[in-house]
C-alpha cells in the first residue's frame, strides 16, 4: 500500500468515523476555508486508485466508503515507520520509546505479557 498525504489521511479519518460519504458531505465536514469540490473529488479518486476507498454509483454521482480499515492502515503505517527509521527492527523502535521515556514500565510489562501469551 502506498503512503498517504496528510490531506488523504484526514479524508480517510472521515470515512472511518462517518462511513460512506458523497464528496459534498465530505466538504461539509471539513473546516473553513472549504476546499473546492474538484479538489476533494480529485483526492478521493486518488484514494480509490490507491485502493483505500471504493464507491457505489447513484446516477451521475458516487458515494465513497473506506476499503481499508483504520486498524489495517495503522499496521501498515507502523510497519513503514519501523522499516524506514529503525532498520526494520521493532526492538530498535521500542528501545527508542524507552530511551525517550515515551513508554512506561507498566506498558513494557504489558508488552511482555502479550508476547508470552502469543507463545
Kindly give the residue locations of the regions a language model identified.
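Short helix-coil-helix linker/hinge
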Residues: 2-7, 20, 87
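Short, cationic-aromatic polyanion-contact patches
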Residues: 4-7, 58-77
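Pre-recognition alpha-helix immediately N-terminal to the DNA-recognition helix
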Residues: 9-14, 25
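Short, locally clustered residues in the helix-turn-helix/winged-helix DNA-binding domain
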Residues: 13-19, 98
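Short acidic, hydrophobic short linear motifs in intrinsically disordered regions
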Residues: 20-30
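Short, hydrophobic-biased segments on the C-terminal half of alpha helices
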Residues: 41-45
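Glycine-centered, phosphate/nucleic-acid-interacting loop/turn motifs that mediate DNA/RNA or nucleotide
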Residues: 51
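Amphipathic alpha-helical dimerization/coiled-coil segments
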Residues: 76-119
Amino acid at each position: 500500500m502506498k503512503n498517504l498525504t496528510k490531506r488523504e489521511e484526514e479524508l480517510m479519518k472521515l470515512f472511518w468515523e462517518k462511513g460512506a460519504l458523497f464528496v459534498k458531505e465530505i466538504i461539509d465536514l471539513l473546516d473553513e476555508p472549504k476546499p473546492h469540490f474538484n479538489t476533494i473529488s480529485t483526492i478521493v479518486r486518488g484514494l480509490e486508485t490507491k485502493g483505500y476507498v471504493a464507491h457505489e454509483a447513484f446516477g451521475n454521482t458516487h458515494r465513497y466508503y473506506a476499503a481499508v480499515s483504520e486498524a489495517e492502515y495503522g499496521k501498515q503505517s507502523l510497519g513503514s515507520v519501523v522499516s524506514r527509521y529503525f532498520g526494520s527492527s521493532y526492538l530498535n523502535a521500542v528501545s527508542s520509546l524507552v530511551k525517550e521515556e515515551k513508554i512506561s514500565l507498566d506498558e513494557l510489562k504489558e508488552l511482555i505479557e502479550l508476547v508470552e501469551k502469543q507463545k
